[in-house]
Design a protein with these regions (language model features):
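Gly/Ala-rich beta-loop-alpha elbow adjacent to hydrolase catalytic centers
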Residues: 59-68
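Conserved alpha/beta-hydrolase "acid-adjacent" motif
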Residues: 171-177
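Short beta-strand/loop motif that positions the catalytic acidic residue
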Residues: 158, 164-166, 170
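Conserved alpha/beta-hydrolase catalytic His-Asp/Glu region
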Residues: 109-156
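Flexible "cap/lid" loop of the alpha/beta hydrolase fold
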Residues: 73-109, 136, 141, 145-148
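Short beta-strand immediately N-terminal to the catalytic nucleophile in serine-hydrolase-like folds
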Residues: 58-60, 82, 165
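Catalytic histidine-centered segment of alpha/beta-hydrolase-like enzymes
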Residues: 193-207
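Conserved HGGG/HGGXW glycine-rich cap/lid loop of the alpha/beta-hydrolase fold
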Residues: 2-45
Length: 216
């Protein structure tokens, strides 16, 4: 099938990763043309050129889902969050989520011990092979995104179908946090896995992405 005949899968990774994060998932998505935004944690940011005439399924992992809601770089036909959230930290009327103080401590410690903070976060995610080089200032800037962004209103305004894939054992985005963010807004499909579903269970994710697209 020619690229012009295939829908486009738009992928955005989360904090501490890069465009290569989705490679295990992309291997299962041959019926899509896959393009990936790179947020610049390991080098220069990469923003693909979008064709507004193409049909898009947008997929954000973790913070990448908030990035899509905030920036909406192209009109899409469906939106999927994996291990995702519309807001990362707790606030009045929104809990459970990550305590504000936890993120404040990460921000305070980051410029003094960026390697340690990054490695600790990756270990919590279940990733024992964190990036071996990264842009400290860009990573610190994106910690502020996690602290400040609140895309609940953007999610409520979303006009296209929204789907959520979540891990029952996710140590970053707990099941209760997932439900707080999406209950009554989007259907949630659960896997027993943790925070890195696209790399740990790419076939499972691919099946659900394809089913979501077919349902549009």
């Amino acid at each position: 099938m020619a690229d012009t005949d295939r829908p486009t899968l738009l992928l955005v990774h989360g904090w501490g990763f890069d465009r290569h994060f989705f490679e295990p998932l992309v291997d299962y998505m041959s019926q899509f043309k896959c393009i990936t935004v790179d947020l610049g944690f390991t080098g220069d940011p990469v923003m693909p050129v979008f064709d507004p005439d193409e049909k898009h399924l947008a997929v954000g992992h973790s913070m990448g889902f908030m990035w899509l809601l905030k920036h909406k770089p192209v009109q899409w036909q469906g939106l999927i969050g994996i291990n995702a959230f519309p807001r990362f930290t707790e606030t009045v009327g929104y809990h459970p989520a990550q305590p504000v103080r936890v993120l404040e401590l990460m921000q305070e410690q980051y410029f003094r011990k960026p390697d340690r903070v990054t490695a600790d976060f990756m270990s919590r995610c279940g990733n024992d092979n964190p990036l071996n080089r990264f842009d400290i200032e860009r990573m610190a800037e994106s910690l502020a995104w996690l602290a400040d962004w609140d895309e609940r209103e953007a999610l409520a305004r979303e006009q296209t179908p929204v789907f959520v894939l979540a891990g029952k054992s996710d140590p970053i985005v707990s099941p209760a946090m997932t439900e707080a963010g999406f209950e009554g807004v989007a259907p949630i499909q659960w896997h027993d896995g943790g925070h890195l579903l696209p790399t740990e269970y790419p076939a499972w994710c691919a099946e659900r992405l394809i089913a979501a697209w077919d349902s549009l």
